[in-house]
Swiss-Prot record:
Its membrane topology: Multi-pass membrane protein
Amino-acid biosynthesis recorded as keyword: no
EC number per UniProt: 3.4.24.-
InterPro entries: PDZ (IPR001478), PDZ_6 (IPR041489), PDZ_sf (IPR036034), Pept_M50_Zn (IPR004387), Peptidase_M50 (IPR008915)
Keyword terms: Cell inner membrane, Cell membrane, Hydrolase, Membrane, Metal-binding, Metalloprotease, Protease, Transmembrane, Transmembrane helix, Zinc
Active site residues of this protein: 34
SMART domains for the chain: PDZ
Protein name (database record): Putative zinc metalloprotease BMEI0829
Length: 379
């Protein structure tokens, strides 16, 4: 009996070691996303009927003085905010039953608002996810600073792309693909996502600028959480003596600035990844679903609470960006409809919305099935 309890409730058990960290991270990210929708809707004068974390049967909840039902539902993988008059899947004014709404409800209904208010409300969810990531990074930069190294080459691996391109120990990176380089991590950031691409490098050698070209090759590395990841590399390294390893400390405003820059880099790398993935140039196993996220949450929790919060930051921006994909079931799909409405002066027809919604729904379900298959069988 004790062994059974330890298996389920012990610190390394399925419940405590995996399920609780996973639900903690996911619930916070989903809550922030939906809170973005809710707060901006309130600021725009839109009424909310329900705010739910999860879907399915309600487990517990309460109704506030504004008439909004706040609830925790049985399946805590997603969340939603149900606005007054928001009856259709596409959150459009087409097909809404006006007679079912009172005069007061019509004033506060989602579909009666100007298109910019509806667009702002929809965009706020992904935006709040990105803001959460920036906030977490800001705290970490303020507390821990950043470890950096000068962009100096200490060694070149024989037979590597760098060796074939003519890189030499002592070279200092000046730019990669026209982007100015200030730390060795800048080089790693650019090169890691460009395996197979011919990249242009400028290095300083003996006081002179030298232009070189190299094609990063794919290498498999183990990240701090023990995950196998495939990255681009050219085969150069630095050392503490050559690279002058050091920690930079940041004040509050500097921390926010660094967090914004880091978040921008992540957005850029994510866009580059999906662009390459669409043409078959990225490893499909780099995409994971709930099983992979749960595994990562378990590993992060075992490393410490700060690791779990870092995972939350990465998951938050991932969900924010995913929701901006221009497919109708997602926030990005709604924004496309609103953009068309703003341009032509009237909503997209109900028939057209229905067609695009069905296509988008199938694509989203296909993507979810793909990543789940990766989780369970392929990777």
């Amino acid at each position: 009996m004790q062994e059974a309890l330890a298996l389920f409730f012990g610190s390394e058990s399925l419940l405590v070691g995996t399920i609780i960290p996973f639900l903690f991270v996911l619930t916070v990210v989903v809550f922030v996303h939906e809170m973005g929708h809710y707060l901006v809707a309130r600021w725009c004068g839109i009424g909310a009927q329900a705010f739910s974390i999860g879907f399915g049967p309600e487990l517990l909840g309460f109704t506030d003085r504004h008439g909004t039902r706040w609830k925790l539902s049985a399946i805590p993988l997603v969340g939603y905010v149900k606005f007054i008059g928001d009856e259709s899947e596409t959150s459009s004014p087409v097909g809404v039953n006006e007679s079912a709404l009172s005069e007061e409800d019509r004033k506060r209904a989602f579909h009666t608002q100007p298109v910019w208010k509806r667009a702002a409300t929809v965009f706020a969810g992904p935006a709040f996810n990105i803001i959460l990531t920036i906030a977490i990074f800001s705290v970490f930069f303020a507390l821990y600073g950043r470890q950096i190294a000068d962009p100096l080459i200490a060694g070149v691996q024989p037979g590597s792309p760098a060796a074939e391109a003519g890189f030499e120990p002592g070279d200092r990176f000046v730019s990669v693909e026209g982007e100015k380089i200030t730390t060795f991590a800048d080089v790693q950031r650019i090169v890691s996502g460009r395996a197979g691409d011919k990249l242009n490098f400028t290095v300083e050698r003996d006081g002179k600028m030298v232009d070189l070209q190299a094609v990063p090759k794919i290498v498999e590395r183990t990240d701090p959480l023990g995950n196998k990841v495939k990255l681009g590399a050219i085969g150069v390294e630095t050392t503490e003596a050559v690279g002058n390893f050091r920690r930079i400390e940041y004040g509050p405003l500097e921390s926010v600035g660094q967090a914004v820059i880091e978040t921008g880099h992540i957005i850029g790398r994510t866009g580059e990844f999906f662009k390459r993935f669409a043409v078959g140039r990225e490893d499909k196993c780099q995409l994971g679903g709930p099983v992979k996220i749960a595994t990562m949450a378990s590993k992060a929790a075992s490393q410490g609470f700060d690791w779990l919060i870092q995972l939350m930051a990465m998951l938050s921006i991932g969900i924010g960006l995913l929701n901006l994909f221009p497919l109708p079931p997602l926030d990005g799909g709604h924004l496309v409809f609103y953009a068309v409405e703003a341009i032509k002066g009237s909503p997209v027809s109900g028939a057209a919305q229905e067609i695009f919604y069905r296509i988008g729904f199938l694509l989203v379900m296909g993507f979810m099935g793909f990543v789940l298959f990766n989780d369970l069988f392929a990777c």
